[in-house]
Amino acid sequence: MSRYTGPSWKQARRLGLSLTGTGKELARRNYVPGQHGPNNRSKLSEYGLQLAEKQKLRFTYGVGEKQFRNLFVQATKIKGGILGFNFMLLLERRLDNVVYRLGLATTRRQARQFVNHGHILVDGKRVDIPSYRVTPGQVISVREKSLKVPAILEAVEATLGRPAFVSFDAEKLEGSLTRLPERDEINPEINEALVVEFYNKML
């Protein structure tokens, strides 16, 4: 299954979850899209609940199904901790996600574009792979030639607050993942146990 590239608002309404972090997609119509509107929500089976939760997490980070599944397999090989949370930490450490958390982009999709276009440096070296795994302490910055890209400057200006697990210097347009987040600091609306149950049946 390839990465979803359609309207984020439609996918957000289908999942009942804001994918941009702004909540704007659900502000006016917080029901699934389609002809029957708010009367179209049906009771999901156990499998349906697990699938829906997996999709919520996958679309939140904007990761394709194959890559998402492979990341889960990697999480199963991590010793210690809780599998579901370990999986979420791997998603959090993606470069595109860290760029988003730092406020260098307004959405993860935009952050992925910035990385793909070569605007982002890791420890002074250009990295154009959105899935690059960031290690706490690495410095994420904007390439010198990209310091005046309007979309980046607008994103920084629009960011009102940042998570406690990142640090950011607005003048230098650089920051870092200072530590791994705690569970209550990320995606409280996600029940990762259902995602684990889904993949335990599939793998």
Curated annotation (Swiss-Prot):
A cellular component annotation (GO) from this entry: small ribosomal subunit
Protein name, per record: Small ribosomal subunit protein uS4
Annotated organism of origin: Streptococcus pneumoniae serotype 4 (strain ATCC BAA-334 / TIGR4)
Alphabetical list of SUPFAM superfamilies matching this protein: Alpha-L RNA-binding motif
Function: One of the primary rRNA binding proteins, it binds directly to 16S rRNA where it nucleates assembly of the body of the 30S subunit.
CDD domains: S4
InterPro entries, alphabetized: Ribosomal_uS4, Ribosomal_uS4_bac-type, Ribosomal_uS4_CS, Ribosomal_uS4_N, S4_RNA-bd, S4_RNA-bd_sf
One GO process term, biological-process aspect: ribosomal small subunit biogenesis
Subunit: Part of the 30S ribosomal subunit. Contacts protein S5. The interaction surface between S4 and S5 is involved in control of translational fidelity.
GO molecular function: rRNA binding; structural constituent of ribosome
Keyword set includes Zinc-finger: no
Residue ranges of every copy of the S4 RNA-binding domain listed in the record: 93-156
Keywords for the protein's UniProt record, in alphabetical order: Ribonucleoprotein, Ribosomal protein, RNA-binding, rRNA-binding
Similarity remark: Belongs to the universal ribosomal protein uS4 family.
